[in-house]
Structure formats: C-alpha cells, structure tokens
Amino acid sequence: MAATDSVSTLVVEGDIAVLTLNSPPVNALSAPVRQAILDGINAAVANPAAKAIVLICDGRTFIAGADISEFGKAPKGPALQDAQNAIENSPKPVVAAIHGTALGGGLEVALCCHYRAAVPSAKCGLPEVNLGLLPGAGGTQRLPRIVGAEKALDMMTTGQHVGAKQCLAMGLVDEIVPEGELRAGAIAFAKKLLAEGRPLKKVRDSDDKMVAARGKPELFAEFRKANARKFRGFLAPENIIRCVEAAVNLPFDEGLATERKLFLELLTSTHSAAQRYVFFAERQVWKIPDVPEDTPTVAVKKVGMVGAGTMGGGIAMNFANVGIPVTLVETKQEALDRGLAVIRRNYENTAKKGKLTAEDVEKRMGLLKGSMNLEDLADCDLVIEAVFENMQIKKDVFGKLDRIVKPGAILASNTSALNINEIATAVSREDGVVGMHFFSPANVMRLLEVVRGDRTSKKAIATAMQVGKKVGKIAALSGVCPGFIGNRILYARTVQAQAMLMEGAMPWDIDGVLYDFGLPMGPFAMSDLAGLDIGWSKETSKSSTIREVLCEMDRRGQKTGAGYYDYDEKRNAKPSPVTEKIVRDFMAKAGATPRVVSKEEILERCLFAMINEGAKILEEKIAIRPSDIDIVWINGYGFPVYRGGPMFYADTVGLKNVVAKLEAYGPKMGASFTISPLLRRMAEEGKRFQDVK
C-alpha cells in the first residue's frame, strides 16, 4: 500500500510504515512539509498493518531546518508543534532516519521521534544562534534531556554541527547504519525495536539529566562567565541559557512556554533581523551581474607567493590548508627562513590545541617551497604579490613576473589601497591582473577583497572569487579607489576620530564608545596594536601630528609598551597621562578650547561618516550592492554581526535621521566633508539600503 502527495510518500513494507519526505533542495520545514508529516504519521498510526514508522528524506539530506523565507510572515498550514505532537504521541515507535544534516527544526523533529538512526556521515545541530534566534520548536527543552545541560548549552550557543559518531556517544543517535543503506538499516532497526519490545522513549519524559543539573547550581553562572567575551553584545546566547535553566528547573510544558516567549522576543528583535540579513548577504556577495557562474576560470593547481612576511606567509597557509602547493619567494635567505619558521610555528600551535595532527603539520609544510628566485614561479597558475606597500616596488615586481610567469596565469596584488590600474601598466597582460586583498592575519580573517581593474578580465575575476571560496574566504568584489571598500570607509571614520581628539575627547573616550557599540576595538587601540610607526620615518618626522610625536618618544604601540595607551607586561591598556598632555598641547597650539564630546556625538560622527562614505562608494559603483559593504565590514573589521553592518545599521536608525544629524554636525565633520547625494536622495524618498539589490 502506498500513499503519495507532492512532497511525501507513505508505504508499508511488512509491518513497517516508511514516510518519505521529498522537498528539494534541503527538505526545509515549509507548510507543505509540515502538513505531510502530520498527515503521514496519522495515516501510519491508523493503518493496522503498520507496527512501527520510519521517517526518512529523499535527496541529499534529512530535514535541514526551518524555511527561513517564512520568518516574519503570517503562518500557513499546521504549526510545526502539531506535526511534532503527532510523532511524539504516536502509539507506534517512530524512528528518524538521518543522512546529510539534521539541523534546527530538522533535529527538533528528530528529537520528537522515539528513536534515531543515522549514517556515519550525518551531522546534527541547532544553529539558530547564528540567525540571532534560539531553537523554537522544543530544542532547548529536549536536547538537554538527552545530552545533559552542559553539552546542550555548548551545542546551542555555538551552533556547531556534531558528527554521527559523537551523536551516538552523547545519546543523540541510537543506531549507526551503513553508509548508503539508510532506508534498509532504519527499517531493520525498527524491526529490531519491535522484536525486543523496546518502550516508546519520549524525550520530554526523561528527567535524569535534569536532576543531575539541579545538583550543580553553579553550572549556569560558570558557563556565562566562561563565555562572557564571546557572547558580548549578543541577545540569543543569553536567551538560550535562560531556556536551558527552565528545562532544568521547570516542568516540560512550562519550559516550552518559556522557550516560546524568549524565541518570539528574539524573532522580533533588530539583532535577529540583522543576523538573518547577513545570512543572505553572505550568499548574495558571490553574485556579480556581468560575471555569470559559468564564466571560464583558470584551474589553480600551483600558487606563487612573492613575499614571505606576515601577509605572504599567512596567505600561503590558506592554500596549503586545502592541498595547493605554494612557492614563496623572498629576496634574502634570512627573511625566507623566518617566514617559513613562523608558518611552522602557527601550525604547531594549532596542533597543540588538538586541531591538527603532527602528520597534518608536516603535510602542509611539505606543500610550501621556499626560493630566492622569481624564475621558480614560471609554472604557477596564480601568483600573489605581498611586498612593501610602495607603488614603484610593486610595479617592478609585476614587470618581472610578466616576463617570467607562463601565459594565461593570473597576477594578483595583495595591496590594501594602491591603484590596481597603475600596477597593471607594468605588464603586457593587463586583463590578467587583479587585486586580492587578504586581511591580517591572513590565515585567520575571513574576508578577501577582490579588486577589479579597468581591464581585468571576467576570467580573472571569476578565478579570484573561486579561489577565495576554495580557501574558505568570503570574497567581496570592489572597484578601484584609494582603500577600496573597507579601508576607504575606515579612513572616513579615522578622520572623525582624529577631529574629535582635537575637540576634547581622549582616545579612550572614543574607543570606549565604539567598543560598547560592539566593535572589537576603537581606532586608537587598533593603531597601537598595528604599530604607530607603520609608514613613519624618523628621518622625515616633523612633530606635526600627535602620532609623529608619540613615535618620536618611542611610544609606538603595544610592541614598545606605550602608544596612545600605556601597557603593562600582559599588554593590558590603560589611559595615558602622557598622551593626554600631548593632545592638550596640540589643542593649545591650534587655539582650540576643549569641550565635552558626548558619547552620542562620538558614535554618530564615527558611524554616520562611515555610512556616508558607503553611500558614495555605491554611487561610484565601487561596490555592487550595500550588503557587500556590510559583509566587508563584518568579516574584515569586526563590525558586530548583530548590527548588520554599517549600511543595515543606517536603515535601523533611519536614513532621514542620519542625514539630519550629519547636517547638524555641519562644520565639525571637516571642511572637505560632503553628504552623499545618494544618501540624501534615499532619505528624501524614504528608502532603505537593504531594499537596493
């Protein structure tokens, strides 16, 4: 006997009913899928021939989560809880058969099944935290009852995906069945349950792990303390913790009510709206209107790296990590040896944390070859230059590479600000020159700015984007302008920060406001970390800026124990009376009278200047879309994901309010400051950046 609808099939094989869901691409819990589960389970329960039920999915995965497109819309069809109740209250055992991923609502459905079987490659998780949400279909109440409060907290606040073997050890999965034999294995497991007379296991009725957690009253306080830095500013992790506290201390149904209340709080929050926006923006950023997905690319099987310093070594690690050999070229053996030693030390530190084996370290180091001869890059498919940020030096390198490297290979510059068009004039293959701006530390930071010159070919762009994806980066396309997307906006903020320094705000005042907003650090702490002497020369220094005076006093940042801040032996920063005196002296020379600069003004002038510059970047078509700017700032500069990026944040403030404030600050913004015509026009028309696709 078989019953079929558009997204499911129900068949009875012997005494086992098999309910198969088929809603490509990931069997998300849309209204038709929820209806299919409810109807299918009820039909199987009503069928006297069926003694047990297997819930399985066609395609590449089990239910991979909620249908995000339904968020914020009027509900259609049955509620997920109705389908879950049908499963949990079935008088016949229901077995979830898991392959691919059981994520979010998918795992929450599986948790309502009495037993769970999975293939070895399957993964389970509750990643709602990444969307600024919590598991809202009983996950916060059922998961702790299976794996315990501590493991549940860790899984839900990190959103991690757990492999089948670990799931079995945790009790999240009851049976591992052979790869490729899920259907037969799950049916066999169901028959085994019937033969052994195993009871119906309702997770909601399991209480032993909750009793154990009640015996550890310090558990939640310790978890909050241990993760305070990681959770700073986010709403969802705290709400997840409160839900697990409810699971431990309240009856199941009261815990569910708590979960629902806290879920709805998050669903209607700006934080979750921002994180969901970022989720889609990270998928949109790869789409380049005039470079379709089927654009031919260069097959990158060997990479050349010119420069083995901090950036060059970090970039090389990205390729070694994915099995692509790299030849690193330096001008001196000492620099080459030092660069390779730093790479090895980085890998060994990772191995000490248990994330790599000793064999992994040697395998990756084996893919890295050092050289002092550019000729060794002749057969590379992609060569990336990461030398000193000087135009003439870069052009000299590119001229040599053009003569050496095989035709058709891509020549890329890691420049953070210089003109790619000018660099390209040094070669005969201008169409093969592209910017690939990695962010430091390059082996850690997710962002890659791909910079398109006037003559850069679509093939070169497609190759650079594909390479970014291959090495695990998020690549955003930028046009040519000083600083590209990220650093150009950073400069606009820096101008305001420096101006407010000369109006009476101290570095720690400005940094403190931006830190409280959610950024990892402010501009002055960032300068101290990078080193104030970057681009500074003792020979040409004229005490004309606060930074020059600090460098002349050997206050060059964290590395010298002092910069804008004073640092102790552990590099903890504290306000510096020396810096304050220098600032006051500069103000006196300029005839400036110190005033109290409010926190509101600090935040608005810094952020609204960024927004204004972002609008100019859009006007000039340097960035394809506003969300690309947000992706750059979230992944390259630590802009808090729960704020959505500077352009999304502008929408939450209201573009009319942004323009009004910029007009009110007027001359304070600087003599050369102008409001973007695009920003002004969008404000007048009541538009939002997030509506610009």
Identify the function of each model-found stretch.
Residues 8-11:
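Short, exposed beta-strand/loop patches in secreted or surface proteins that constitute
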Residues 100-106:
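Gly/Ser-rich catalytic serine loop of serine hydrolases
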Residues 126:
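Small cofactor-carrier domains centered on a conserved lysine used for covalent cofactor attachment
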